[in-house]
Amino acid sequence: MTNSTTFQAEKINQHIVKWLLDYATNAKVKGFVVGISGGIDSALTSTLCAQTGLPTLCVEMPIHQAESHVNRANEHIDQLKKRFPNVFNERADLTPIFETFKNQVPSSENEAVLNLSLANTRARLRMTTLYYFAGI
């Protein structure tokens, strides 16, 4: 018995890139802003955006980031910039902002609740930073 479903990576890739181009056109935006963490999700997303040919800004935003993640993020950005002339990058170290925020709000004795709240805070700081770069 043969499997009639085959994975066609190039066809899927082209479909996603076309969808991104259509989305950008309909939204009347000139390009993409992608946060780069050093993980597979941001690497894939930024590569697909770069393949559109539209300006793609890769933003690294460490907050107490492991050096290995920072290195992976920088290596990915460097490789993208070599492959695609439409890729640019910025770095915004959010660690001082995060620490200032933590010092201005009450803590919690429940460590699990505190850790979740701080994880959400890191995500929102990064989101706000990406909105900033998209707006300028």
Ranges and model annotations:
Residues 2-136:
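ATP-dependent adenylation/nucleotidyltransferase module used to activate substrates
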